[in-house]
Regions:
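Residue-level signature of mid-helix packing/kink "hotspots" within the transmembrane helices
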Residues: 35, 63-71, 156, 271-279, ...
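Cytoplasmic helix-loop-helix junction between adjacent transmembrane helices
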Residues: 112-150
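Extracytoplasmic gate region of multi-pass secondary transporters
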Residues: 37-38, 227-269, 274-278
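C-terminal transmembrane helical hairpin of 12-TM major facilitator-type secondary transporters
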Residues: 289-337
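Cytoplasmic membrane-interface "Motif A"-like loop-to-helix N-cap segments
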Residues: 79-89, 286-298
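A late C-terminal transmembrane helix in Major Facilitator Superfamily
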Residues: 346-378
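Helix-loop-helix hairpin linking two adjacent transmembrane segments in secondary transporters
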Residues: 146-197
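Conserved MFS/SLC helix-loop-helix module at the cytosolic interface between two early adjacent transmembrane helices
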Residues: 68-104
Length: 411
């Protein structure tokens, strides 16, 4: 195997697919750990004496850290390159889930989850930056769809195996389940280290300091762009919808009468749909079709909020299907739109992605926390679904505004 030199990534088709595989594994461990709490809410609440509001605050804790860490992590990524940055990111993910296994109360569990907020932005900003460097055109959309199946599959594994297999196998000890996920994250890190050292250059060449603006100047320039402003607001709404339902879906289904194991299986349905959607829709979302697809995904999110309140299998299944369609691809298409906006480009992709996720994770905090608070106040999930339906409607309106701004002539 040949070690690639800086600037030669895109010239070696086989190597870039190996790198994409490494990104897929790293992002898969990210998704695995993100979902790891959802199927274990009941035993964690019981052992650590937590309310729904408390567990909701824990679910949103890493996103709160993420808000402050995303932009610095994007800068770090641009400075040291994806090879080292992504290795650091997956190591922090493994440390976070290991800390959860060792937590003794609310505050130690909260601290362990917050560590994930340091590693998460490195991974979620690094993956689109590397894909933007490696692929172009419709292949870029396909590659983004491929690596986004990683966290989706990680979520399927956590939801499907936790209560049906791992908990019985490990004597119903949720801490040991967290330990298993820590080992999985470490293995993903080792594999990425091997692939990265074989194929990824130590650092991407950059212009001299005299020739390139500061990161702060770049951020200020980007945030003054009206299309970027709208896109950042939309990212908040998308993550509010995604993180809210991702974290509470198993409990929502259990509240409707399912057992923990059955709810875990049903909760995998949106993720399985999302895997297929991630492979198909981003590739179809070329500039001429992108905003039509984005608007349709927002309508799908709205339909999910309406249908998930039913206990009858037919509307419930339909709700889970459209939820999976929306949650798996809304973020991908938005990021694709961001990195291809005039004035962004590959050179600014790291900072732009950091800004995207920093804004988006405001919704990532509000989603899980808000649903937990609303449950404690109302005793159910209907009020939360109503609120998410309003968010989805506003996202659809945002698509119209974003299309007009993105297609406006550049001055």
């Amino acid at each position: 195997m040949m070690l690639l030199r800086a600037g030669s990534l895109a010239a070696h088709p086989a190597a870039r697919w190996w790198i994409l595989f490494g990104l897929w594994l790293v992002y898969g461990s990210f998704g695995l750990v993100v979902v790891s709490i959802a199927p274990l809410v009941a035993p964690i609440q019981q052992e650590l004496s937590m309310s729904h509001t408390a567990i909701g605050s824990i679910m949103g804790a890493w996103q709160l850290v993420y808000i402050g860490a995303a932009i610095p992590c994007g800068m770090l990524l641009d400075r040291i390159g994806g090879r080292l940055a992504l290795l650091l990111g997956v190591a922090l993910v493994a440390l976070s889930v290991l800390g959860r296994a060792l937590a003794v109360d609310y505050f130690t569990f909260l601290l362990a989850v917050m560590v994930f907020g340091l590693g998460g932005p490195i991974i979620s900003s690094g993956a689109p930056k590397m894909v933007a460097e490696l692929f172009s055109g419709s292949q870029r959309g396909l590659a983004m769809g491929v690596y986004m199946t990683g966290p989706a599959l990680g979520g399927v594994i956590a939801l499907a195996l936790t209560n049906s297999w791992l908990m019985p196998l490990l004597d119903m000890q949720w801490r040991w389940v967290m330990g298993v996920w820590a080992v999985c994250a470490l293995l993903a890190g080792v594999i990425w280290m091997v692939i990265a050292w074989l194929y990824v250059p130590a650092a991407t060449p950059v212009a001299t300091n005299a020739a390139r603006p500061s990161q702060l100047a770049t951020m200020l320039e980007l945030v003054r762009m009206p299309a970027v402003q709208v896109l950042l607001v939309m990212s908040t709404g998308v993550f509010l919808f995604n993180h809210g339902l991702n974290n509470w879906l198993v409990e929502l289904l259990r509240h409707g009468g399912m057992s923990a194991t059955t709810a875990g299986y049903w909760a995998t349905l949106p993720t399985l749909v999302g895997i297929v959607a991630s492979l198909v829709l981003p590739r179809l979302a070329t500039p001429e079709r992108r905003f039509l697809i984005l608007g349709a995904l927002c309508i799908a999110a709205l339909l999910a909020c309406v249908l998930l309140r039913f206990q009858d299998p037919v509307p419930l299944t339909a709700g889970l299907l459209v939820q999976g369609l929306a949650r798996a691809t809304l973020m991908t298409v938005l990021i694709l739109t961001l990195v291809e906006l005039p004035g962004i480009g590959e050179a600014r992709a790291g900072v732009a992605s950091g800004m995207f996720f920093s804004a988006a994770e405001i919704g990532g905090v509000l989603g899980p926390l808000g649903i937990g608070v609303m449950f404690d106040l109302s005793g159910g999930f209907d009020s939360s679904l109503n609120a998410l339906a309003v968010v989805a409607s506003l996202l659809a309106l945002g698509c119209v505004v974003l299309k007009r701004l993105a297609n406006a002539p550049q001055r």
